[in-house]
Every structure is written in C-alpha cells, then in structure tokens.
A protein has these predicted regions:
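Conserved N-lobe loop of protein kinases adjacent to the ATP-binding glycine-rich P-loop
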Residues: 27-34
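AlphaC helix of the protein kinase catalytic domain
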Residues: 95-109
Length: 162
C-alpha cells in the first residue's frame, strides 16, 4: 500500500532533514518519474524573515532554467505545509560522493572527473550571476549529482573504472 504525501505524490522514502524542512523521494501516482519533495512546515514560515526566504527560493527556482541547477516542477500547499517538488538527483551530494570514492578506492576522484564537475559548477554559478542571483551557501553538501542523464551515466561508469 502506498502512502500519499500530498495530492498525487506517493511517498517512497525520506531523503533528509534540514533546519526547517524534510526532503522525501516521491513519485506521481501511476508514474515511474521520481522527485525530491521538500516539505516545509508553515510554523517556520510564520516568521516574516523565514517566509521571505521561502518565497525567494520559490521565485528564483521558478525563474531559472539551467541543466546544472535543480528544476522546480511544482509547488503544493496544505493548511500545515508547503511542498516544493523538484528534480531528484540520484547521485546524492558531492561531499558524500567524494568520501565514498575515497573509502572504496583509497584515492581521490580522478582529475578528469574533478575538471568535469568544476566546469558544471562554474557554469551554474555564472548563469545565476548573469541573472543577478547570489547563492549564499555553496558547499559540497549542496552540490547534487544526477546520474540519470546520459553524461552523468558516462561519468559514473568512468568513476567505476578508475
């Protein structure tokens, strides 16, 4: 039996928890497409500063379209929560990927992969800056990897071969 998170979103599993939200892996009922759905408690949003932060995040995500920035697909709302339905990045965060690779192979990421990742990160930052958007929390934990793209699959296979 599937558990509904909100509307037509089926809960698959909890991915993580932040200061003011929880993130779930979800799918639309009857679809194999997967999403990362951020569930934000409206109690947090009752603080004007927090509400402004949430509104800004939604406005920015709706306005941007770049292959290296997570896409916002939908915003849902109930009496208790806001739900931001975004692209799911199945590779996790860069910090964990670096640690896992180091643990498994006892060496750092191959230089070719580092160069590839840096190119993608710089491309995303350049895009945001051209739109006069400043990301104030760039860190390895906030850089997500998606292996579902053709390029992502090639890089993942390369990592496994090194």
């Amino acid at each position: 039996m599937s558990v509904m998170l909100v509307d037509d979103l089926t809960l698959i599993k909890k991915l993580g928890k932040g200061v003011f939200c929880e993130v779930y892996l979800t799918s639309k009922q009857g679809s194999k497409e997967r999403y990362a759905t951020k569930k934000i408690d409206k109690k947090f949003a009752s603080n004007p500063k927090a509400k402004k932060y949430i509104d800004n995040e939604i406005t920015i995500l709706k306005d941007i379209d770049h292959p290296n920035i997570v896409k916002l697909y939908d915003v849902k709302e109930t009496s208790q929560f806001f739900y931001l339905v975004t692209e799911y990045c199945n590779g996790g965060d860069l910090s964990s990927s670096l640690e896992d690779y180091q643990d498994k192979y006892n060496k750092p990421f191959p230089e070719e992969i580092v160069q590839y990742l840096m190119k993608q990160i710089v491309s995303a930052i350049r895009y945001l800056h051209k739109k006069t958007i400043l990301h104030r929390d760039i860190k390895l934990d906030n850089i997500l990897i998606n292996y579902d793209t053709e390029e992502g699959q090639r890089k993942n296979n390369l990592l496994k071969q090194k």
